[in-house]
Amino acid sequence: MNTQAHHVITDEHLINEALSRSVAEILPSKDGLKKELQSGRRLTFYLGIDPTANYVHLGHSTNYLILERFHALGHRIIVLIGDFTAMIGDPSDKTSMRVQLTREQVLENLQTFKAQIGKILDFNDIDNPIEFQFNSEWLSKLTFEDSVELASNFTVQQMLERDAFKKRVAAEKPLFVHEFFYP
């Protein structure tokens, strides 16, 4: 996509507001991002979500507000939908396996997500539309051979370093192989 095709706003006041309201930290640096935003180049920002429930947690709304500020400045916004990974379920901070969702359940949840985040993100901007990408577009194409090749780069010990997994092993609670595949 041509990064110069859209009008990008470089107003210092608006950029400062985007970089300071509801923002705790910017990595690698606030000054570096500010310089990029003032350059006039169209940047790409994305946020990934796994629709594992039929609602958006209120705490996530801040992320969408920040994305909308960058969108209003003319930058490209991608909402990366973890439709494939939602079927696995993020094992972080879980003391037991998440209930596995069907593809249909994930897609139903996604419709609710879109309706809720559509109240924050401007989906009606035809000059700079919000883009949706789905991780199933590439993950569902992986063959078993691809999965084995990827898995050969990691050890069980590395996987067990994750806090949630350590706790479940220590508590002698089941840990299922598919949970290791959650990125």
Language model regions located:
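A charged helix-plus-loop insertion that forms the helical arch/lid used to bind
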Residues: 91-107
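Divalent-metal (Mg2+/Mn2+/Ca2+)-assisted nucleotide/phosphate chemistry catalytic cores
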Residues: 102-103, 107-110, 114, 119-183
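Non-catalytic terminal extensions that flank enzyme cores
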Residues: 1-51
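N-terminal catalytic cores of NTP/NDP-binding nucleotidyl/phosphoryl-transfer enzymes
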Residues: 33-91
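A glycine- and small-aliphatic-rich helix-loop capping segment at beta-alpha/alpha-beta transitions
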Residues: 63, 96-98, 150
